[in-house]
């Protein structure tokens, strides 16, 4: 399985022949919705596949720079850390999206928004948990 990554998390594609051919993408999120980024897959022992990603759930359109001198319109690395799941190996994804609760760290509390807006960076590759 592979994810098509752009700012909308277009979908997952499946291959059953080791990557020689791929099925059509299955959307994880609604096309044209808010930014979703930095997705990573996890296959659990039960067979359930999770996709974890950043989501601009509050539809923030611009942010202040760390020194408050500039307005920045790149908004794909902020918001909420969320997940959806698939019980059919990526043929479909849960309707429900789940926010992952986390505690604020000093870097969150010290950002220009005092932790009311969080910034994320998630880089990874798919993995299987046995």
Where are the predicted features?
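Asp-box/BNR beta-propeller blade signature and adjacent active/binding-site loops
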Residues: 1-130
